[in-house]
Amino acid sequence: MSKIETSGPVVQVGDARFANHLPLTLIAGPCQLEGRQHALEIAAALKEMAAGLGVGLVFKTSFDKANRTSGSAARGIGLDGALPVFAEIRETLGLPVLTDVHAAEQCARAAEAVDVLQIPAFLCRQTDLLLAAAATGRAVNIKKGQFLAPWDMKHVAAKVTEAGNPNVIVTERGASFGYNTLVSDMRSLPIMAQVTQGAPVVFDATHSVQQPGGQGASSGGQREFVAVLARAAVAVGVAGVFIETHPDPDRAPSDGPNMVALRDMPALLEELLAFDRLAKRRTA
């Protein structure tokens, strides 16, 4: 199992297609939805970049960071404030949108304005949440918990598919390794694909370099290793890569230490696409 099998299901999200044997797809955007104009500007910049490189794009952002280290940390604008922004990004820019949900009752409302519901890593085994997300018919991206073995995702993904929704994506975002540290085991990528019957596998390159609680009242991160881990994962042959980005990461309200500066995204993605072509034996 040196790399992911070159066949399997395809999850269509707007114009983007996720499959382990197809060209790499990008999920990107700011960690937190900070406001309408901020989100639109980032989404427009990412759209232009993706179009220039010929890569599928799903815009991501979070309306609520419900698991912040400190109760006093900024959480976001909330679902009510986010829904019009999500809808505007879809309608004016033509981009599919992904956001995370934290409670079963959020799923149907979020699904009105987004294309992908994301299950946070800490909540990946919450059956009611998974079933509610599945019931919307939207694609469901499940982050593998930092506490799970990759083969445990078999049963997690099955909760969605057995509920009648085949549009499942599974994402690796690191495993807990001692205190305030995550490590990435690249073996997990083909293992997750195998145990989920070929579900598209995504590598979360920015949360994988997070240092949970590493700054006391907030999480730290090592963004200098984002490209290192992303290259390794894409070389395995994944369906997509997840990268949080911001115009000024050091001033972002959450996850700044592990986000990639927006200006650095084109060069990083161009490099990753070269690795993707090599992994999937395609020509430029």
From Swiss-Prot:
Disulphide bond pairs: none
Any one of the GO BP annotations: keto-3-deoxy-D-manno-octulosonic acid biosynthetic process
GO cellular component terms, A-Z: cytoplasm
Pfam families: DAHP_synth_1 (PF00793)
Pathway stated in the Swiss-Prot or TrEMBL entry: Carbohydrate biosynthesis; 3-deoxy-D-manno-octulosonate biosynthesis; 3-deoxy-D-manno-octulosonate from D-ribulose 5-phosphate: step 2/3; Bacterial outer membrane biogenesis; lipopolysaccharide biosynthesis
Superkingdom field: Bacteria
Xref: InterPro entries: Aldolase_TIM (IPR013785), DAHP1/KDSA (IPR006218), KDO8P_synthase (IPR006269)
Subcellular location: Cytoplasm
Gene Ontology molecular function, alphabetical: 3-deoxy-8-phosphooctulonate synthase activity
EC id: 2.5.1.55
Record key words, sorted: Cytoplasm, Lipopolysaccharide biosynthesis, Transferase
Reactions catalysed, as given in the entry: D-arabinose 5-phosphate + phosphoenolpyruvate + H2O = 3-deoxy-alpha-D-manno-2-octulosonate-8-phosphate + phosphate
Family: Belongs to the KdsA family.
Protein's name according to its UniProt entry: 2-dehydro-3-deoxyphosphooctonate aldolase
Organism field: Methylobacterium radiotolerans (strain ATCC 27329 / DSM 1819 / JCM 2831 / NBRC 15690 / NCIMB 10815 / 0-1)
